[in-house]
Each structure stands twice: as C-alpha cells, then as structure tokens.
Amino acid sequence: MISPAWSLFLIGTKIGLFFQVAPLSVVAKSCPSVCRCDAGFIYCNDRSLTSIPVGIPEDATTLYLQNNQINNVGIPSDLKNLLKVQRIYLYHNSLDEFPTNLPKYVKELHLQENNIRTITYDSLSKIPYLEELHLDDNSVSAVSIEEGAFRDSNYLRLLFLSRNHLSTIPGGLPRTIEELRLDDNRISTISSPSLHGLTSLKRLVLDGNLLNNHGLGDKVFFNLVNLTELSLVRNSLTAAPVNLPGTSLRKLYLQDNHINRVPPNAFSYLRQLYRLDMSNNNLSNLPQGIFDDLDNITQLILRNNPWYCGCKMKWVRDWLQSLPVKVNVRGLMCQAPEKVRGMAIKDLSAELFDCKDSGIVSTIQITTAIPNTAYPAQGQWPAPVTKQPDIKNPKLIKDQRTTGSPSRKTILITVKSVTPDTIHISWRLALPMTALRLSWLKLGHSPAFGSITETIVTGERSEYLVTALEPESPYRVCMVPMETSNLYLFDETPVCIETQTAPLRMYNPTTTLNREQEKEPYKNPNLPLAAIIGGAVALVSIALLALVCWYVHRNGSLFSRNCAYSKGRRRKDDYAEAGTKKDNSILEIRETSFQMLPISNEPISKEEFVIHTIFPPNGMNLYKNNLSESSSNRSYRDSGIPDSDHSHS
C-alpha cells in the first residue's frame, strides 16, 4: 500500500516533468524568424540565405528553399531528423555537390540551377524513397556519375538531367523510371545496353543533342515496350529512325533535323501513333504507303520541307483526299516544280503531277479579262506573303479571267491592280457554293517554306481586297471550292491566275523617295512655259548678285581709305575686320622693340593704323609672376613667344 506522502511525491514529479517537456513541444512547433510557416509548408525562399535555418517544425512536409545562396556546408545535420518532409525545393542555390543530411523519406527533390558535378551512391542511398529527381542546369557528366549510384533508388520515376555535360546516357538506371529527360546535352551515341531494362519508361526526351543515324544503335528503342512519347528534335538525323516500339508509341517528334528520306518501314506497326511531326527537314517526297499502318493518326505536321510535287507524290494527294475529317494534316505545300509552287498537294489535279502514263489533259482555260473599274468594298487585310524564287520566263497577264472546265463548277476570276500594293479580286460562280479557299503568293524569289497566304471566303461574297503587297511584282492568285466539312471536292481543280501589281510612279512620281527607287530619273517633257521663264530669271538674278558680291569683295580696300578705324566704331569687331583687309606693311620685331614698316614708299597716315591688345584665350597667363626674381623684361608663355604686355614700342 502506497503512503499518502509517496503519492504526493509521484504527483509532483509528473507535474515537474510536464512543465519541462512542454517548452520543448512549443519550441518544436515554432518557426524560424526568417521563414514563414503554414500548416507544414515552410517558406524560406528568396531570402539570400547561405544556410538552412535551424528550428524548422517537426511536422513540416514541404521546404521551399529556392533562390538563395545555400551551399553544401549550409545544410545542417539535424535536417535529416525531419521525417515528415516529402518535398524539398533547393533549386537556384550554390551547391557544388549532391547534398547529404537530407530527410530519409523525401520523395521529390529539386536541385536544378546549381553547380553539382557528381552523383554518388552514398548520397542517393540515404534517400531511398525518392521518386522525382530534378538535376537540370548543372555540371553533371557521364564520368561523374558513380557506377551503381542508382541501385537502391527503387522508387525513382522521374529523372531530369537536361542541360548538363552528358556525352552518353548514364548506365545502371533503375527499371522504375517512367520519364527520362536528357535534352540539350552532348550525347552523340546511344548503345542498346544504355536503355536496356527500362521497361517502365514512357517518355524519353533527347532534344538538342548530337545524334545522327550512325550514333543510334540497332533497335536501340525497340525494347522500350511501354514508351508512349519519343522526342528527337534538333539533332542531326538524315533519315527517320526505324525499329521503333509499336505497341504503345503515341507521339513521335522528329522536327528540326536534316531528314531527307524516310525508309519504307520507318512507321510500320505504329498503330497507336496519333501525332507525328517532321517539320523543318529536307524532305522532297515520301515513299508510297508510308502511312498505311498509322491507323490512329490525327495530327501529321510536315511544314517547311521542300516538297517536289512530281509523279511520286501523286499517291499523297489520293491519300489526303481519302482521310476522314478528324485527321489534321499540315504543311504539304508544293515548292517545285514552278507551275505548282505554293499550292497545296491535296488541291492538285492529276494532270499537274506530270506522270508519263497519264492521259489526262488539262481543262483550265484562260480568256481575256474585262476591265473592272469599280472600287471594291471594304476587304480583309491578310498577312504579308513570303518571297518566292525567280521565274526565268514569267508570262504575266494583267486583269485576266480564268475559268474551269465546263464539266466542273465554273469560277470566273478577275484581278485588277488598285494601288501599287493592293489588288482587287472579283469572281463569279456558275453554281452556288458554301465556301471557297482563296490563296495568293508572290513569284520571282528564292523558295521559302510556308510562302502561300490563304483565307476562306463564304459563297455569298464576290470580291476581295488584298493589301500589303510589293509594287511592280508578279503574284499568283488561286481559288478552289470547299464544302462545309472542310474537305476539298474530289472533282474540283484550283482556278489560278497570274497578275502584277502596278509600279509606284503611276501613283506618286513627284516624291523624293519614289524618284530614288525608280530605275531612271523622272522626266516630264510638258513643263509649263511660265516655269521655264521663271527659272531663267532666277538664274540671271543669282549670277548678277554673285558678280556684285565679288566686285565689293575685290575692291573693299578702296572703301577702307575713307573710313577711320577708331575706338568708337564697333570695338569688338575691329580685329576681325582688320584680318580681312589688305596690309601693305611688315611688322619687324627686334630685341626689345618692334616697328611697323611700309612695303611701299607711300606716307603712312597716323590714324590709319591702330594697335590693339589681343586678349589671350581662357587659362593663358600673359602677366609676369611678381614672385620671380628674373631681371628679364619679357615673360613667356608655354610656347616661348614674348608677351606683348612687356614689350617695348
């Protein structure tokens, strides 16, 4: 049985322990003075910190430490005791090594924009539950990653190593990785073992490296059975890669390479692919049937390629016309031959492909235009057209009309130049149409991708005003009917016409700018008689005035004899005027005196010569230093010329 005294002792002990533990609990939940804490989120970012502050609450889950100056020494050892922290943002700091003393259960670590050079097993093994590792914009190289550094990172799903110094893909990556970003490195070769075993990889980004077809190993991507997105943008490929994983690949990006051919089996079995981008390459044609296995394709981007619309591309026209409405194809615009430059491949008729076995004869007719002097209603203002290559023998016909075959829906086009940079397009339709596609491009310059300008006009309209064109330049204008489903009619041929904008001198020949731009100076043989007479009178007047001025200047000394240059007459200009008069005397300077001697024997008038003191410029001292003990009666400037104030006359 416990005595009352012992019971009181135990109660007092418990109370004392409570008051001792309570302050520790309060301290544990306190927030560092330089940070802001909000329900597990600790905001210590953008504070110019050099170390992680102490006293972070134990219930913290996310640490925002970015945009500081924290270095490796500034990471305290007690940081690893924060067992609830799952996300740490340490990007844009001063780390030069992979940080240690991190919480064990961290899942997301942002270390981009530091100067980290090495990745070691010791640093990664202490955070085995890491799922996302961001190491973009550091100095990691292939040799600085320790072999087996990731062998305990069994939960790693995202690894970002963009903009580092990698020359190859790091080996020994965990099988759990789902997204791997290696863009903007120096990778030139990828061997099959590099990606071996990454069966969970879904997204692989290799943009901006040094990869070519020789640097890609055979079937290097074939075993990536779960890969859904592959990006090889901005590399040096000359052919589309083959042996791609066909079971899951949905997006393939190949733009900005040097691809000039596509192997016939490049896209075989890619039945899940729905987006393919091969823009900005050197493709001129495509092998027939290259897209046959693309059952789910919905976005095909082929912009900025020098497509040659010859007989080899006729199958592409047929394939485009058979596509359903949901398929969006962009960039199949002819760049050659000359007669179809700037036209969409799907708009071409069969005879325009110049197939030798084709017996189709063109039914496009060109008739003389009927001038239309009526000014058009307010039109639209399209974007400027990119310049096109020179045409050796252009046959440009102004204000002409073009019609289609009588068996087709006839369109009669009339084009008239309104101003040097504006043309008026009008048309008449034989049958009602829902909409028409109107396109125009400039001829006569080097080929440029995406050169044609297009717009859709409704069937109710009958005219269009095109502005912002170049004066005195040839243009091709085409129209083709469209249906409401946005698909071209299979039996419609584009109706085209060539015209030329008016020269500038037809509208404003008197401005200086236009005269400078004209090849020959502006001439007007019909000058008014009054203008000729006025010009002659002006020339005679100018000649007489010049003669009078010359005579006054030549005989100015005669007038000077009747004038006395005294102190009361424009004192400030005496020296300036004296410098312009003819002087017939010589100033002789002897040892301590000077004398004016006339050249001729004519007597010198006393009042005709007056000597004035010439005031020196600012900063020049003409006075003798009173402190000097020299006995000379002359003081010198820097140039050694005797000072006139101390000369004897």
From Swiss-Prot:
Entry comment on modification after translation: N-glycosylated. Proteolytic cleavage in the juxtamembrane region gives rise to a soluble ectodomain. Cleavage is probably effected by a metalloprotease.
InterPro entries: Cys-rich_flank_reg_C, FN3_dom, Leu-rich_rpt, Leu-rich_rpt_typical-subtyp, LRR_dom_sf, LRRNT, SLRP
Transmembrane segments: 529-549
Membrane topology type: Single-pass membrane protein
Effect of residue 160 to A/N: Abolishes interaction with ADGRL3
Subcellular location as annotated: Cell membrane; Presynaptic cell membrane; Endoplasmic reticulum membrane; Cell junction, Focal adhesion
Keyword field contains Cell membrane: yes
Annotated consequence of substituting residue 183 to N: Abolishes homooligomerization and FLRT3-mediated cell-cell adhesion
Disulfide bonds: 31-37, 35-44, 309-334
Function: Functions in cell-cell adhesion, cell migration and axon guidance, exerting an attractive or repulsive role depending on its interaction partners. Plays a role in the spatial organization of brain neurons. Plays a role in vascular development in the retina. Plays a role in cell-cell adhesion via its interaction with ADGRL3 and probably also other latrophilins that are expressed at the surface of adjacent cells. Interaction with the intracellular domain of ROBO1 mediates axon attraction towards cells expressing NTN1.
Protein name: Leucine-rich repeat transmembrane protein FLRT3
Encoding gene, per UniProt annotation: Flrt3
